[in-house]
Regions:
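A broad, low-specificity signal for short, low-complexity segments enriched in glycine/proline
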Residues: 1-4, 55-60, 142-149
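Alpha-helical structural elements
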Residues: 8-9, 20, 126, 238
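Helix-enriched interaction subdomains in cytosolic or periplasmic regions
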Residues: 1-13
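Alpha-helical cap/lid subdomain in secreted, periplasmic
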Residues: 87-275
């Protein structure tokens, strides 16, 4: 385990931008010429605390240049609303999309920041009528707000959850359909997707996403890869992560390099077959 001065980052992620996008990605910046594969997703795709996250490992295994467009706070909206990034995906040989939660996107009940999708902006009149006793100005983040609403009323919250699930499927399908070329979906978590009729793990990412929602997208994708990391795999990779002392709680939430190597192996085989 590598520690640096208290509060200082232990890795230089060489932040960079692509095209006209305002989002910051992990660098160094890659050339967008010739054959390459694009990767969309959240903090695991970005590879926080990892010297070599799975997009880079895929490049090593396949010889195909990887363009890592993973973003720490991005949900579906950040990509769907960014024409520049969609154009980059359309120029690639394939696009891998790590599935992100259904909570970090705008919907009938609330709006999120267009780039930092974890940021709650405002409640709609539907939500304020449903929860007429809640002061929504108290919330800055979607997860905090949803946790509070769920604690107040399970019956009311079921309406919110169903809206998020429905909106996620529609938004994901729109994202896939706006990408020219092959799309591979990646489930990456410390648990399997819950089956229809089961209660999804309430506080685990990707939040509210179940197997039925993923299956609703399979007709529009080239492949779906499922990686459910075991506690042993996560623990085995902990010593190879790089972070400062202040980042320990956040680092403990990450899946780690052993899991990323398994993801890369599966993706490399799939991409070789598709291309």
């Amino acid at each position: 385990m590598t520690f640096e001065k208290l509060g200082e980052p232990a890795l230089d992620y060489f932040p960079c931008r692509y095209g006209t996008s305002k989002l910051l990605f992990r660098g160094p910046r890659r050339r967008l010429e010739g054959d390459f594969v694009t990767f969309l997703g959240g903090i695991e795709t970005y590879g926080r605390f990892l010297p070599t996250p799975f997009p880079a490992l895929v490049e090593h295994e396949t010889g195909m240049r990887s363009v890592n467009l993973g973003c720490v706070n991005a949900g579906v909206d950040a990509y769907l609303n960014d024409r520049s990034l969609l154009d980059i995906c359309g120029r690639s040989r394939a696009t891998v999309i790590q599935l992100t939660g259904a909570h970090n996107m705008s919907n009938r009940f609330y709006a999120v920041h267009p780039r930092r999708n974890d940021r709650f902006l405002r409640a709609s009149r539907y939500l304020t009528r449903l929860y007429d006793d809640v002061d929504f100005t108290e919330f800055n983040f979607t997860r905090h707000m949803l946790t509070s609403l769920a604690a107040r009323s399970a019956e009311k919250f079921d309406q919110v959850r169903q809206e998020l699930k429905s909106a996620w499927v529609a938004r994901m399908r729109a994202l896939i359909e706006n990408i020219d070329g092959k799309v591979v979906l990646l489930w990456l978590a410390d648990h399997k997707p819950c089956e229809d009729g089961e209660d999804c793990v309430a506080d685990k990412d990707p939040l509210f996403v179940d197997r039925g929602m993923i299956q609703a997208l399979t007709d529009a994708t080239a492949s779906v890869i499922e990686v459910a990391a075991s506690p042993a795999e996560i623990a085995a990779g902990r010593d190879d992560m790089v972070y400062g002392a202040m980042d320990l709680p956040a680092a403990e939430e990450m899946l780690g390099p052993v899991v990323h190597r398994r993801v890369a192996d599966q993706l490399a085989r799939t991409l070789d077959r598709l291309m």
